[in-house]
Amino acid sequence: MAIGWVIDHPAHARLFAPLMREMSNPNDVIIACDRIEVRSMIEQSDGFLPRRKTVWVPRPIGKNRFRKALKRYRISRKALKNIELVISVGAPIELRAAPKKSRRVYITDTEINHIAHKYSKPTDIVIPSHFEDKLSGNLLQKKAVIHRISGLHGHAHLQPRMRPNQVSNPPKILMRKLIGDGIHDDGEIVEFPDAWLNGLNIINANENQYSAHPWKLDEEISNCDGVITQSVTLASEAAILGVPALLISNAKRGFLTRLQKDGYPIFISNQADESTYAAWLAGLHLLDELDSIEWPDVKSELLYILKH
């Protein structure tokens, strides 16, 4: 069975990697969004992601987004002509461009991605058990089979790692700021004071500026004492790995609520407030007090859904 894998964001490449290693075949095609971090991951994917025919499509944002969307639709329609299964994470265009008889799987954990939800045309929708249905508009009213997975996307591709047994002096902190041009970034991005970085050893992983190997970002995170970021994806992955994450964002996600409820080390500030910052700094030194949290087998759950 020929499969189309839609990689619209670097996190999608990480999610797909263990799935492709299990079920991809040489007839598959990767539809990859032409953005710096996605291109970096595809070009340096040896040993991580199977090499497949890759078709590059534009990212439909900015002033000419409708023209870019149409161009992307045409490119994808041609590339997916003989594809039987299309798998997309929050990217709707390829689900419309896919053959009518194909199975079209739409994976999402982002409730407020309403534009993508609206234009997606799936046969199957895959959401996490903590997905806040009421925030997702009419997504779950579509004529599609609804599947629910028990954990976060990060549980599918991350692995528990050894952590430093003491905090560095100064603390080693990975920082990731976003450009803020994403389809649902408006209203979510919150700036934080430069003074918050004083006295910290900062590793720069800002969007489009990370210079280390893109597939080893999780190793970099695990080797740090903490993370400070505007990215909900990076914050959630750090928390899953047991690294105290300070997320400065107005974003509302079911998985953020889940992480807090389950006791993961994530600190969320939607106003860059000093109290949350102070709590995070204190949390850097409390790793010994973290309880062991169950690791859901999301990879197996996704493989079962995609194969049946």
Go through each PLM region and give its residues.
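A nucleotide-sugar donor-handling region in carbohydrate enzymes
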Residues: 123-187
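Catalytic donor nucleotide-activated moiety binding site of glycosyltransferases and closely related
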Residues: 34-35, 44-49, 53-60, 175-178, ...
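C-terminal amphipathic helix plus adjacent low-complexity
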Residues: 283-308
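Active-site and donor-binding regions of nucleotide-sugar-utilizing enzymes
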Residues: 5-23, 33-140
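Donor nucleotide-activated moiety binding/catalytic core segment of transferases
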Residues: 71-80, 207-236, 240, 251
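Structural motif
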Residues: 84-85, 172, 225-226
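Catalytic binding pocket for nucleotide-activated donors in carbohydrate/polymer assembly enzymes
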Residues: 240-288
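Charged active-site motifs of nucleotide-sugar-dependent glycosyltransferases
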Residues: 2, 169-173, 201
